[in-house]
């Protein structure tokens, strides 16, 4: 018997377990899923099932942002990529599917708790009234966001939820360009040989190993970072702190723009006054850098790190850096470097050895905090980076605030929708029509409308 945790895509609610024998078919699984979800009104055979298998070949953890979005009825880009792929064939047995995808006990990937295993896609209109209400609420919420963004010009980016599309939009809104810069050979310093971080695994009841999540290991990897820069921390009166979930310390409104950045990061390196008086962290005293830790670094994670860097840079007076890392072979540094013409430039450099990365961090921490009085730019030297490394405060690089585009027709439609909704309540068909009009106004999507 296999216990599979299933989640219905686009419908708010927790994942639910379905017990099924490995020898039963995917068609049988569809029937079991329908039996567990009373609101599904279509025949079980019309359900579409997809394995919740991540890029790294593992099951989707239930605390992954994509899984959290599922619970809220949102469709994360990682989930969209999965349901755009190959669906589970109704004629295959569950064992066939797991074996073909290397998700078996023999491969160390048998389904277990705290994971999502099956994504369920239900054709539109296949739910009962309760779900229709939920879908209407979601649509109205989307129109609310369109109203804020199109009419009021407001945008809000939550760091941990920034998708590739949103990340590019943020950079475009602020006229920021990201440039990858080369690293160069450097004579290794003392103590440059550092072992990569070992992600902790635990043995569960059935004897299988499970890798703990980033959240569960924050204290442990904080100590790993602290151990490898401890001497410099002491000399510079700095410390490494882990930012607890729910502490949205990197929340800021971009000056002169209706853009808000919100959320937190994993680690901060800042004044050791915070170690003595933890509540002072809200003021970010002497902060030097943030560290965003991912067990598996993906290209899309760049945008989360960039969003966090922009927020931290705007919150403090001195230049800062961001590091995106798996604490093994991916150490990606970001910093605001310069302004060319009207665009701010954020530079990005990658290092693949922990020892070299810690040399960069140690060198960064001993740098003087501010730029000379007669210039906006600081130039510093860092090991492995091409010299000089330019640093600039983002406020100095942001372009002047320009006039908004001609969104008159869209604004009128959304304002008209709100006028009607304020008197008669939400109208789902009108909300859909407004959504379609906004979509058609976006060049990328106008081709398909």
Swiss-Prot record:
GO terms for cellular component: extracellular region; host cell. It is found in: Secreted; Host cell. Transmembrane segments: none annotated. Its main location: secreted. Glycans are attached at residues 102, 341. Residues 18-54 are annotated as: LQLFLAK domain. Disruption phenotype: Leads to a reduction of virulence on soybean. The keyword Zinc does not apply. It comes from the Eukaryota. Residues 1-17 form the signal peptide. A motif (Nuclear localization signal (NLS)) lies at residues 217-223. Keywords: Glycoprotein, Secreted, Signal. InterPro entries: Crinkler_N. Secreted effector that, with CRN63, is critical to pathogenesis by modulating host defenses. Suppresses cell death elicited by the P.sojae necrosis-inducing protein or CRN63. CRN115 and CRN63 may share the same molecular host targets that are involved in the cell death signal transduction pathway and that their differential activities are dependent on plant nuclear localization or not. Forms a homodimer via an inverted association manner. Forms a heteroodimer with CRN63. This is Crinkler effector protein 115. It comes from Phytophthora sojae (strain P6497). The lineage of its organism: Eukaryota, Sar, Stramenopiles, Oomycota, Peronosporales. The gene is CRN115.
